[in-house]
């Protein structure tokens, strides 16, 4: 099995992910070891069995009186959003674009092989400390501008995707968990220190039980990383027919971490 990259082994300079990214010194750091062991445990892998409850069971949610936790200031204005993969040049251009939000995509626009997933995590960390840069073969240099940048939301892989490079009890782990876990471990506190937060776009959700599972992952992560409850926010993409019938329930399950629904592009 593979441990997550340590803070020291991640670099924001352009490079091919090396063995240092796959052999982590974070194992010697108790908080990192504790976080990762729990995060990748088999009990945290979502099981789709019996995931289709009767809508009558959730009628109280649809007719009840409840509300989500308040949104942070930087998620109040989302009139324009831009999306793209987590390669260096695309990220810099998106963050500099003037859009309200940049959805940094580890899913559909990103071929999910190991190099891309790990290099994407390197680039995400570089974006938060503003060290990310890129120079093309013609010598043109790209860097983050001074002043306002687009607010970044991370789209991990869906729950149906597995990651064969991280084994849990001899089996492939969840690609979604790997993306979420590496991002939170390396960037949750960085994002908060930068005046924003660890924000996600959740794809391919099919119902409120999947939303409940993500809510438990977020709450567990906040506790282990020592960040305030509700710091993690998620926008859920409604892109399956099943989720369209459970939108209220999805919002309710994620109410402490909810940042809205999106019907896709």
Specify the residue positions occupied by each region the protein language model found:
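Low-complexity, highly charged intrinsically disordered N-terminal segments
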Residues: 10-60
């Amino acid at each position: 099995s593979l441990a997550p990259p340590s803070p020291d082994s991640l670099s924001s300079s352009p490079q091919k992910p090396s063995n240092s990214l796959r052999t982590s010194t974070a194992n010697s750091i108790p908080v990192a070891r504790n976080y990762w062991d729990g995060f990748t445990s088999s009990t945290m892998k979502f099981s789709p069995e019996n995931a289709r409850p009767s809508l009558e069971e959730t009628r109280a949610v649809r007719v009840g009186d409840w509300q989500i936790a308040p949104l942070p200031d930087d998620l109040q204005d989302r009139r324009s959003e831009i999306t793209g993969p987590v390669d260096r040049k695309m990220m810099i251009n998106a963050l500099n674009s003037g859009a309200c939000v940049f959805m940094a995509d580890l899913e559909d626009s990103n071929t999910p092989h190991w190099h891309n997933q790990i290099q994407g995590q390197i680039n995400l960390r570089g974006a938060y400390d503003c060290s990310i840069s890129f120079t093309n073969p013609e010598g043109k240099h790209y860097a983050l501008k001074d002043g306002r940048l687009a607010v970044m939301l991370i789209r991990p892989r869906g729950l149906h995707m597995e990651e064969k490079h991280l084994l849990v009890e001899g089996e492939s782990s969840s690609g979604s968990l790997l993306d979420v876990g590496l991002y939170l471990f390396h960037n949750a506190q960085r994002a908060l220190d930068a005046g924003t937060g660890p924000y996600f776009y959740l794809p391919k959700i099919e119902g409120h039980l999947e939303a409940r599972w993500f809510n438990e992952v977020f709450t567990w992560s906040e506790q282990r990383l020592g960040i305030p409850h509700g710091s993690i926010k998620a926008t859920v993409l409604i892109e399956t027919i099943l989720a369209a019938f459970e939108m209220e329930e999805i919002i309710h399950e994620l109410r402490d971490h909810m940042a809205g629904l999106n019907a896709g592009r």
